[in-house]
Amino acid sequence: MKSLYTLLLAIFITGNLAAQDTFSIIAVDPVTGDIGSAGASCVSGVGAAGIIDIITDIIPGRGGVNSQAYVCIPNTNLQNAIAEMEAGASPSEIIDYLLLNDSCSSAGFNPEYRQYGIVDLDSSGDPRTAGWTGSLADNYKEDRQGSNFSVQGNILLNQTVIDNMEANFNSTTGTLADKLMAAMQGANFAGADSRCLSSGTSSTTAYLLVYHADDAPNDPYLRLNVGQQPSGTEPIDLLQDLYDNFLGVE
């Protein structure tokens, strides 16, 4: 834990770039009001904490933001995006704000190094989505939106990661959590994050986070986090085990 704290403190003080995430999805359920996020990355140095508190934030009943690719720690662009959402900005308005007001000192406050996925529910309860992928984020990179979700990734093996995550999310019936877990399974193959190809896994760390509309910000319905795993151990398999245990599946 001390070594993780030292790493995070060093990154914060020096303003070094840190590629913290590769593939993620953020989504809303306009029927239930649930909002959730899931993602994974082939990073080292994050330890048991993983990336869940670095790249995603959710306002229960309102919306959520994933901020990834090259980020500062703490993730000031994520914090600013959430503040804009709290002030009433739509996902597309938040993207516009972030592009004009990049607050990460790494790479000279250049939004071309960033990647975002944003979803919310408007005043009528209808879903809205937006995304952004900067030209200087690592290839393969893409963000893709549906009516109630945004899936995004960078430093991916290829487009298949995004294709599979989108297809699994759309084809899965059940709760928002079920759909997010299925989306993650779509990226469960060697090299989904290309840095993990040699280890035969998709990533080194993964998470799943879901809020009901009436949850307190510090008390989500579901928070599953798989911290950094050794080479050869598949985090999405472990995430599935945690999810099955949460549901009581044998």
Residue ranges and their predicted role:
Residues 1-4:
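Positively charged n-region of N-terminal signal peptides that target proteins for export
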Residues 20-250:
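N-terminal nucleophile
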Residues 6-16:
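Bacterial N-terminal signal peptides
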